[in-house]
Amino acid sequence: MASYSMGDLKKGLKIEIDGIPFKIVEYQHVKPGKGPAFVRIKIKSFIDGKVLEKTFHAGDKCEAPNLEDKTMQYLYDDGENCQFMDTQTYEQVAISDDDVGEAKKWMLDGMMVDVLFHNGKAIGVEVPQVVELKIIETAPNFKGDTQGSNKKPATLETGAVVQIPFHVLEGEVIRVDTVRGEYIERANK
């Protein structure tokens, strides 16, 4: 298994600490006035979603996790688990709603997503960074709405709620950034 030294660490890298796979979500190289440089990182567990802070000094090493990404089709949610299918082998995998986490609010039936496997066990889901979803409910526009705050809440077809500009109407399809949970633009449909 490959290992990473302090200089290899960067945001987005996947590492393993004490047998648990993590993703680096924040990276900071610190060079104090006195003493050796070190790296401070925030890591998010793929298993339980907890965020931890770790410090690495020169010479410290961490392992690369045994992770595999597989593109699969999201089929449905049975109330406890989300069901996914490998479109080439037709093998189905169930992942608990807790393990799917925040990704669930951006997933539509039939959507292709990346399912993450650790040592052969499905542990999480990564949706595309940008998805197109239909607005099913939002407040109507009134004359003078452009004064002050120029955003209104909108419920999307997955149940997620995002803030959208007043000129966007119910029934329109919009592009949403799934990382920040924000409206990007109207979709070209």
Swiss-Prot record:
Q: Does the keyword Cell division apply?
A: no
Residue pairs linked by disulfide bridges in the UniProt entry: none
Give the GO cellular component terms, alphabetically.
cytoplasm
Q: Which domain of life is it from?
A: Bacteria
Main localization is cytoplasm
Q: Where in the cell is it found?
A: Cytoplasm
Pathway of this protein?
Protein biosynthesis; polypeptide chain elongation
TM ranges are none
Question: Keywords of this protein's UniProt record, alphabetized?
Answer: Cytoplasm, Elongation factor, Protein biosynthesis
Might you name a Gene Ontology BP term for this protein?
peptide biosynthetic process
Task: Spell out the molecular function terms from Gene Ontology.
Answer: translation elongation factor activity
Query: Which Pfam families does this UniProt record tie to the protein?
Result: EFP, EFP_N, Elong-fact-P_C
HAMAP family linked to this entry: EF_P
| Family per record | Belongs to the elongation factor P family.
Protein task: Involved in peptide bond synthesis. Stimulates efficient translation and peptide-bond synthesis on native or reconstituted 70S ribosomes in vitro. Probably functions indirectly by altering the affinity of the ribosome for aminoacyl-tRNA, thus increasing their reactivity as acceptors for peptidyl transferase.
In its UniProt entry, what is this protein called? Elongation factor P
Q: Which organism is it from?
A: Campylobacter jejuni subsp. jejuni serotype O:2 (strain ATCC 700819 / NCTC 11168)
